[in-house]
Amino acid sequence: MATTAQHANVQRARQGYEAFSKGDMAAIGELLADDVVWHVGGSSPISGDYKGKDAVFGFFGKLMEQTGGTFKLEVHDILANDEHTVTMVRETAARNGKKWDSKAVHVTHPDSAGRIKEFWAFQENSTAADEFFS
């Protein structure tokens, strides 16, 4: 079977998830547009629209604080073209004696330089996510 080259946005996404797993905010910062908008659906205390890199990094900090640093992402697959990147992930975490283990889909739109301009997270069970993070 012939091997095909990965789309550049697949490579960037893999770099981003690897940087997140290592807590490498400098590397993540290079992958984000300055005016990035990060959408986290639901009605929990971490839900909302985070605008700009500082707000996104603040969200990451809040996520780690809420889970005592246990929040992890496992990438299952990444699909991409010039306009979208879709990543299927498994999320795990622990919080207040509860365990979180869920599938999610992350959708990003890159800017002309390939940096993430907009991000959406879609949970397998948004009600359960709201309960876990509340």
Predicted regions, residues:
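C-terminal and inter-domain tail/linker signature
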Residues: 1-134
